[in-house]
Amino acid sequence: MARLRVYELARQLEMDTRELMKELHELGIEIKSHMSYIDEETVNLLLEMYGTQEEEEELIEEYEEYEEIDEEVNGKHFKNKEGSLEKLQTNKKKNSVKITEEDLKLDKFAEKIGIPQNKIIQDFFMKGEILKPGQSLNLQLAKKIAKMYDVRISFENEEKEEVIENPLIEIEKYFEEKYKNPENLKERPPVVTVMGHVDHGKTTLLDYIRNTRVAEREEGGITQSIGAYQVEVNGKKITFIDTPGHEIFTEMRARGAQATDIVVLVVAADDGVMPQTIEAYNHAKSANVPIIVAINKIDKPNANVEKTKQELVNKLNLIPEEWGGDTIVVPISAKKGQNVDTLLEMILLVAEMQEIKGIPDGPVRAVTIESKLDKGFGPVANVIVKDGILKIGDYIISGKVMGKVKALVNDQGKRVKEAGPSTPVMIVGFEELPDSHGIVYSVDSLDKAREISEKIREIEQKELRRKRHMKLEEILKMMEQSERKELRLVLKADTQGSLMALSGAINKLRSEEISINIIHSGVGSITVSDVMLATASDAIILGFRVKADSQARKMAEAEGIQIKTYTIVYKLIEELQAALEGMLEPEEIEEITGRGEIKKVFKIKKVGSIAGVQMIEGYVEKDGLVKVYRSGKLVYEGKIESLKHYQQDVKRVDAPQECGIKLENFDDIKEGDELEFSVLKKVARKLTFEEDKGEK
């Protein structure tokens, strides 16, 4: 039977084309449409599985003709390549088993299909493939195992419940489409977060800018703490998030609510780069936000600006512009205000270079800095508008919480009618307290807000029991489906020496297909900040001779972040290496298994030429490869279509036995031809430790 198109085979099988396509997909046979071709081997298999009575009789007739042949090898007949008459007559469909995601473990899968796990492992080992007890299976491998034992499987979700699409996705798509057209965008003020080590002057800097730059308040006005404020510099505005540090920054990132456009990293000139400086830098770098360094406390007698710059280079790889790099570094005194104006000008310069823009009108998207219950206003949210114009009377939604804007209060405590991009305001009018660090959207009507709210609540209820971040094994499984394979780590150790040794060893696990990105490393116990960063970056946390503090453990458990701790270096490296090696595509090698010689050629109608082979050495496998040599020259290289010993289909024949072999798509065989048999084996690849080549 030649190859056929899907619809042609469906016609022969008297099946609906769509039904056949579904069956093919379940069998793991890739087809694109009803016009796709199916190869000859698959056609024959499907005819045997689903064949009509007419085809069955044809196969039986072929079998009987095959049995009548007088030519023998060692006095025995060959049989039909697909097995016994009984098999042809029964022609039963394969057993069908439904599996769920929970069944994709070798032990559970084996139980499901009724085959002992040890037998599966042994059979695959004989084919040159290694399976381990209880190992995770992807759907492709599960189908391969099922096919080996004539079992059909179909995949179904364990929970047969309606999938509810998050309505906020559609709202986000609106903004995505708007951003694709530059004509829809307009320059907006940059939003700045100030980060740095404790006591390096973050709060002092923010207070100085606020006190000297915020516009004069009207008599009787009060300062309203809404988590951010705006200043004006040379006719342009800058919005500062009023809570210094990277905690809020990272929490917002973890919720997909990135508000920061520029980070000012404060480093004290008398103290240099400290652990929290490195931590803050890693948070900013992970978010791909531009960094300006403010070297503070230059008024101190022991201030050393040049030494601090050198530490920026050595510890953070931040090279100042004046040293040939691209990092803007401004020496300042936040206490005395020295060079703070220059810092503000540099912020505007970076903003101009970054082309920070937003949608100036229409529906609103705003980032929540914090939410709280106000004694006078009830549930309120302090936000920075990212896009659109927020107005009194707008219907709003933040996650599952809805509301209607009753009042807007700016950073000067004044009520305003509207707020545009990058403007910080307090929203009054939520029905209940919205989540901090979420996103607020405006919608057309109260009904729309209520509809979204109800759907989000339903989604959250369903996700609550399934909510978890990726474990190491799941990250690797995801990477298997991705072209770019990157494993992100947060690394903590007991000493700087241990940290350097571990970082060096991990970075030497090299592969073109998989990279390890240590997004943050530090000395000391695993903290809430580490968990927040891992949450925002889908990373796992590795600790060496350190523990996670109680708050970090609670947060990790709530967020589903995996923390793995070790006390022996090689155990950490060994486990990481083993996990990564499991992700490498195995190497395929050809291994010669034996040699044989054709003693007799049998011509069989509708089947072709069968080689009567005397095995000389080694063995031959049914699913193996073969090369045919005639007078020392290669005349054929391909696959073995069928292998028989006496009248039985067999998987393997060893020397010095005789056997019958049918070659795939090749009948021009002659007595005296020499055969070389081989198999393709998949060999697990190893990651190797390499010497750094000029890297630091």
From Swiss-Prot:
GO MF term set: GTP binding; GTPase activity; translation initiation factor activity
Chief location category: cytoplasm
Metal-binding found in the keyword field: no
Domain tr-type G span(s) in chain numbering: 187-361
Keyword tags: Cytoplasm, GTP-binding, Initiation factor, Nucleotide-binding, Protein biosynthesis
Cellular component, GO annotation: cytosol
Region (G5): 333-335
Residues where GTP binds: 196-203, 242-246, 296-299
Gene3D superfamilies to which the protein is assigned, alphabetical: 1.10.10.2480, P-loop containing nucleotide triphosphate hydrolases, Translation factors, Translation initiation factor IF- 2, domain 3
Annotated spans, G2: 221-225
Chain intervals for the UniProt region annotation (G3): 242-245
PROSITE patterns: G_TR_2
Compartments where located: Cytoplasm
Top-level division of the source organism's lineage: Bacteria
Listed PANTHER family: TR-TYPE G DOMAIN-CONTAINING PROTEIN, TRANSLATION INITIATION FACTOR IF-2-RELATED
Sequence similarity: Belongs to the TRAFAC class translation factor GTPase superfamily. Classic translation factor GTPase family. IF-2 subfamily.
Protein name: Translation initiation factor IF-2
Species in which this protein is naturally found: Thermosipho africanus (strain TCF52B)
Gene that this sequence comes from: infB
